[in-house]
């Protein structure tokens, strides 16, 4: 065997193979991908440089995610899984082999996407980043316990420590050792006094006065008493240590580990063998890390089980309009809607109450006096009323103690076995802070432990900025420093990573369910930096979402730091700054869907600008750009939010212009979502759409009479099952089925519209239930989905497919792209109009029957936009969008801007929360919230046209938008 040659073992899926080969001297420089065909990829070949910061870009739907997540990440994960035993694999869930010929030089892959945010109410920023675990350890090791009742410091000492402290008193000090046997308890306590006398003790201290046990002692049984047995009297001098130790042990036995030393000058020293308060008698268990976990019974508040809140039925949701009478349907909660029917049992109960307490059911609910209101809501307090009810067995009179609406509905909620009924009841509930822990989630004894004068909840409720200051200024004793040094080092490092990714406004106590996709992703990014792994391929999905331009530099510095550690970074991104900062940009396209899946260009941002085929390059170079409107439209009216103070909003008044497009801007965490989503949308939804929502804290909204409905167009899926698709969501499928049912063939066979649905029996293939595929469980291998062998994936039975419209079956039509269908249905105006809007929003490439589960968030949002555009507007609608540019390329943003202006042209109002400067510069009006995130935000910094905001010296948004105008 030659010098450069060696034999080495290669691990393959089939077992070990002995390969004779040459060991390469240099390390593999690239991740080499050959023949990638996942989703719309067209046998793509690409060499991605390793240990570099690589950006994948291209139009929405071009195949970026198919290459990054479905090919590179999936194969990296699969190879790791393959190295495990089949026993271990069955617990991990399997990954299918991606449709690719080969991938070489692939490092272990870690995906940080937006979808896998934990929605568990127990999950917080602190628990996800594991910083909270370090804080639990810190508090358990160096925390100072306090009595939760009186606030005094609680400490515990051994007998030797107690003796040493007493011996340290000035010599000749007269002391008496007291055993506190009764603390703050009512009663005569004859047995206690008798027992003390029998044990040979002579004196007791009762309520601060000294008594001889030989005298008659009578106590008032209705008063609380404190009784201490005087065990010994001593004068402090060197030779008393032996006697003192014996006496101290006696006291501790008598008083369950407590000792009070009374110096004759009136001072008292309290000692405890365990963590207990000598004054209040409250004792604490051993302090451990689990004492500070709200997910563990040892630490969690017993009342709310550590959630910090309770779901409780809300009177305002059960009776939304109090100007209506009960007879006219004021009570809308489940089970009581029937009380408008005079023959119902609920009405019979209310009639009986009205007769007993002399009130009318025809009176508007808001006019009832407090007594009647409380009877209806909270019950009759056990008092019965005579209910006359005509049932199936005739008329009966029943004695009923009315429990009140809230108790009644709570009982029904507990007793129902139906999940859907439970969900319906939950729409009448609101989240209220737990009365026992006031939202702090832990037991009082755990909240009594402090470090730097703050308990663990107070520390985790500080913003990351303030937490960093707290950690820097923390003053600890020498012993505390010695114990906590390593823990503090870990906490400081992890907290600084969160600040580095622009999350300095968040708190560790913030629930992860309330985080945006971008925030959740950046938190996981910070956690990964903390882990310090090297030689890994990190695959990220638009980490810049929700990040203001001001904080972009921080994020880019973090990404470069990950790269510099020795990792490969693959970032799916549309942000211009990120592309310019990358070592390499991979442009996939040229179009979307069928027209994408090819490698258009690869190289630096400068290389892309020179490439005539790259649309991305043309936008980067400025050859293509989104134009600034020549004039800004004038508002047709105003909507005024008064006294907004949800979360960090500082009791502000905000004017929203009507009939135009408004952008609400500001740095991350400034209060944009609190203002628009929590207050504006929820209040309008409640008042205009009659939705059961509770708006955020505010005084009022003036001008709602100018609107007739509010629509929130978000990026949530258009359906949760593969049975929903763009055709069903937009209403196209109904019209297409009408067309098929109207054909001569369908009429001759007697087929109605329902025959052409794959959701009901009749026309669908029954072998697969209209799914077109069958799932085969493989236990420790991944489940295999195979096309149905009866219909061959077409979802319908043979007879249905024989009915043709213009030579195409219903399956053929569902398989068409929007572009193909547009040409096919040109003669049918109602269908053509809906297809045209789908085409206009940039979805020419999606298939009409494409399962909604395969659509991205951006695609789902644009389908919703298309559905809105195709409706005939009233000119009184307000549309609310939260970061609609997520997942959109420059070219897609161009289309989106045109759509948003089309929506507002008919007199409708569009309110957009956005960081994308191309959208902001085209807005008619900007409301800039800030100036900072968290506590430093919550005020209106600037408002007006983009030109006016650009002149503001205090607006960060103005500074950046000025360059785009």
Regions found by a protein language model. Name each.
Residues 2-965:
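Conserved phosphate-binding elements of NTP-dependent enzyme cores
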């Amino acid at each position: 065997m030659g010098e450069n040659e060696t034999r080495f073992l290669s691990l393959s899926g089939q077992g070990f193979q002995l390969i004779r080969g040459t060991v390469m001297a240099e390390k593999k420089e690239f991740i080499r991908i050959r023949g990638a065909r996942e989703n719309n990829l067209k046998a793509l070949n690409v060499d991605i440089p390793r240990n570099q910061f690589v950006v994948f870009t291209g139009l929405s739907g071009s195949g970026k995610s198919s290459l990054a997540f479905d090919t590179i990440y999936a194969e990296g994960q699969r190879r790791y899984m393959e190295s495990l035993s089949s026993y271990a694999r069955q617990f991990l869930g399997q990954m299918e082999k991606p449709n690719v010929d080969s991938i070489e030089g692939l490092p272990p892959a870690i995906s940080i996407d937006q979808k896998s945010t934990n929605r568990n109410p127990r999950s917080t920023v602190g628990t996800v980043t594991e910083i909270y675990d370090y804080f639990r350890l810190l508090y358990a090791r160096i925390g100072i316990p306090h009595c939760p009742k009186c606030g005094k410091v609680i400490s515990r000492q051994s007998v030797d420590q107690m003796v040493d402290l007493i011996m340290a008193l000035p010599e000749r000090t007269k002391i008496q050792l007291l055993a506190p046997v009764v603390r703050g308890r009512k009663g005569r306590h004859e047995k206690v006094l008798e027992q003390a006398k029998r044990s040979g003790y002579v004196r007791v201290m009762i309520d601060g006065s000294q008594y001889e046990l030989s005298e008659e002692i009578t106590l008032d049984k209705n008063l609380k008493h404190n009784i201490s047995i005087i065990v010994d009297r001593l004068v402090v001098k060197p030779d008393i240590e032996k006697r003192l130790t014996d006496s101290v042990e006696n006291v501790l036995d008598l008083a369950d580990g407590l000792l009070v030393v009374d110096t004759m000058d009136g001072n008292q020293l309290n000692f405890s063998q365990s963590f207990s308060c000598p004054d209040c008698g409250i004792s604490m268990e051993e302090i451990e890390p689990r004492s500070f976990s709200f997910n563990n019974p040892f630490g969690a508040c017993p009342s709310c089980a550590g959630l910090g809140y309770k779901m409780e039925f809300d009177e305002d949701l059960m009776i939304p309009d109090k100007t209506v009478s009960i007879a006219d349907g004021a009570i809308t909660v489940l089970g009581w809607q029937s009380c408008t029917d005079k023959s119902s049992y609920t009405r019979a109960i209310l009639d009986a109450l009205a007769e007993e307490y002399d009130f009318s059911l025809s009176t508007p609910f808001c006019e009832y006096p407090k007594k009647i209101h409380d009877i209806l809501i909270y019950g009759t307090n056990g008092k019965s009323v005579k209910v006359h009810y005509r049932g199936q067995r005739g008329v009966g009179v029943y004695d009923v103690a009315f429990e009140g609406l809230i108790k009644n509905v709570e009982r029904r909620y507990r007793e129902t076995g139906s999940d859907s009924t439970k969900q319906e009841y939950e729409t009448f509930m609101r989240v209220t802070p737990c009365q026992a822990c006031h939202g702090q989630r832990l037991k009082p004894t755990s909240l009594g432990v402090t470090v730097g004068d703050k308990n663990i909840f107070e520390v985790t409720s500080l913003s990351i900025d303030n937490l960093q200051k707290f950690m820097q200024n923390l003053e600890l004793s020498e012993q505390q420093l010695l114990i906590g040094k390593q823990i503090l080092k870990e906490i400081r490092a992890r907290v600084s990573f969160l600040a580095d990714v622009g999350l300095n406004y968040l708190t560790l106590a913030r629930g992860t369910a309330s985080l945006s996709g971008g925030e959740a992703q950046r938190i996981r990014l910070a956690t990964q930096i903390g882990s310090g792994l090297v030689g890994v391929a990190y695959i990220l999905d638009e980490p810049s979402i929700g990040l203001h331009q001001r904080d972009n530099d921080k994020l880019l510095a973090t990404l470069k730091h990950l790269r510099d550690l020795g990792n490969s970074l693959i970032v799916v991104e549309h942000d211009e700054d990120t592309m310019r900062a990358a070592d390499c940009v991979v442009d996939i396209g040229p179009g979307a869907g069928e027209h994408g899946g090819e490698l258009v260009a690869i190289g630096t941002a400068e290389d892309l600008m020179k490439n005539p085929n790259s649309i991305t390059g043309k936008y980067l170079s400025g050859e293509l750009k989104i134009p600034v409107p020549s004039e800004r439209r004038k508002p047709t009216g105003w909507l005024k939010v008064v006294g907004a103070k949800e979360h960090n909003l500082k009791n502000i008044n905000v004017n929203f212009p009507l009939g135009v497009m408004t952008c609400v801007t500001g740095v991350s965490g400034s209060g944009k979502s609190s203002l628009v989503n929590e207050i504006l949308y929820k209040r309008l939804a409640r008042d205009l759409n009659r939705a059961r929502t509770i708006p955020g804290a505010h005084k009022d909204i003036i001008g709602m009479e100018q609107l007739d409905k509010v629509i929130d167009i978000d990026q949530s899926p258009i359906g949760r099952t593969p049975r929903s698709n763009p055709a069903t969501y937009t209403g196209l499928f109904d019209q297409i089925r009408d067309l098929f049912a109207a054909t001569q063939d369908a009429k001759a066979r007697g087929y109605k519209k329902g025959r052409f649905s794959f959701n009901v029996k009749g026309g669908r293939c029954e072998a697969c239930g209209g799914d077109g595929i069958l799932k085969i469980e493989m236990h420790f291998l991944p489940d295999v989905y195979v096309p149905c062998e009866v219909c061959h994936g077409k979802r319908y039975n043979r007879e249905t497919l024989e009915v043709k419209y213009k030579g195409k079956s219903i399956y053929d039509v569902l398989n068409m792209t929007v572009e193909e269908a547009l040409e096919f249905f040109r003669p049918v105006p109602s269908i053509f109009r809906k297809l045209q809007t789908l085409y206009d929003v940039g979805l020419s490439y999606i298939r009409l029957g494409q399962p909604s589960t395969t659509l991205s968030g951006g695609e789902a949002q644009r389908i919703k936009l298309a559905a809105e555009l195709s409706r005939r507007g009233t000119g009184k609608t307000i549309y609310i969008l939260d970061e609609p540019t997520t997942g959109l390329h420059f070219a897609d943003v161009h289309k989106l801007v045109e759509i948003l202006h089309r929506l507002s042209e008919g007199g409708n109002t569009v309110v957009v929360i956005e960081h994308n400067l191309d959208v902001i510069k085209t807005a008619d009006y900007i409301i800039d919230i800030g100036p900072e995130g968290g506590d430093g935000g919550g005020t209106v910094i600037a408002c007006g046209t983009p030109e006016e905001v650009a002149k503001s010296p205090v607006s960060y948004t103005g500074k950046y938008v000025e360059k785009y105008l």
